[in-house]
Amino acid sequence: MPLIFAKATKTSIPVIVLDSSALEDWRDAQPTRVRNWVTSSTFTAALGQVLMVPSDLGEHLCALMGYGSASKRKRGRFALADAVNKLPEGCYHLQQGLPEADLDEQALGWLLAGYSFEKYRKCPLPAVQFKVPKGVNAVRLEVIAAGEALTRDLVNTPASDMGPDQLEAACHDLAERFDAQVDVITGAALLVHNLPLIHAVGRAADQQPRLIDMRWGTQGPTLTLVGKGVCFDTGGLNLKPGNSMGLMKKDMGGAANVLGLAQMIMALDLPLCLRVLIPAVENAVSSNSFRPQDILTSRKGLTVEINNTDAEGRLVLADALALGDEERPDLMISMATLTGAARVAVGPDLAPFYTDSDALAQVLSISGARVADPVWRMPFWDPYESLIEPGIADLDNAPAGGFAGSITAALFLRRFVEQAKDYVHFDIYSWQRTAAPGRSKGGLGQGPRALLEALPHLLAL
């Protein structure tokens, strides 16, 4: 079902949102029949609770939605999204009860509640639609929901149907819809074009490694998005154990997130010059796999000692970042499912990001909170630079000891960005482990909404 609001002309059932403190006053102000109906029910205005109130004719007079308490709402996002699937099929409109500051988040939650990944199995949701609440920008929220759906679809698709070939096809599809241009460097041509790390990581796979380069827009500040596109990660010769390989279809989550964000930017026609760089590879095992102790030379000229072939994401990103940096963009952003250490540090819900700009970090943090896309700043901690310097080469792709793994990975990437005016790196999870309001189990966007909200401030749009 498209994640869109119902037409304003459609007949609809009013929705009344009540928090725990407002229920009694509202109920006491109703006609006797309604008051008795609510009193005899189990409706307490608990968060996400729903009660349909009938009219004298037995039709739906209204729907009550519980908004719980402020303390309960703070413990999650999209508090009313789950209520959607408790409603009978039909069209609804918000009549009263939501604070103006909460309208955008809850309206977006209603849209996202309609997401279902049905490529391999039909899982129809109830046909429930909402009209856009007064004061909400319907077009913007629908664009955001569509971008999130693209990200989720890409991450949810298994590697058998989402290898480098298919990820490239997804980029072409997106570019065609928005009149963007795509260039792709594939296989041995990567060496000709001086992208050796991307080639080294992906050369062992049946589908050739590639660098996907998409451009859109001709005027305005320059924004370059770099997304890790490791379509499946076996770990390479440092083979992952089985339980660690189970979710590796999502190792292209960085690419999926930058494509979702790119779609939002283009659909909203933001006045900027956009470039999207995706190194698309599969980290496979074969006779020509890159090896532990190999020393590889990057596009930038920095040499890298390979101390773990399972730390491949930073390698492919390094070449892509170096390429993007050559154009001196106003803002460069990398997104990657890069380290397990980031999950240990902040868990699966928060998207940690790194930047040297305090002003940029503040804007991102405020923006993330405003659009229910929580992000958390982590430090580019300069004293740890020595940890990524092995002695035999310029850089170590997997420092021994395991301390500060997300930070050292971010420091590694920063070595390849020198000319961009500002740089931000996101170390994301891109996965929802269990279903939550507005977030079905599976692929997840982390960071794009915060970035979209922040871009007008960061780039003076």
Question: What kind of feature is each model-predicted range?
Answer:
Residues M1-G229:
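Short amphipathic alpha-helical segment within the helicase RecA-like ATPase core
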Residues E168-L461:
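A generic structural signal for tightly packed, nonpolar segments enriched in small/aliphatic residues
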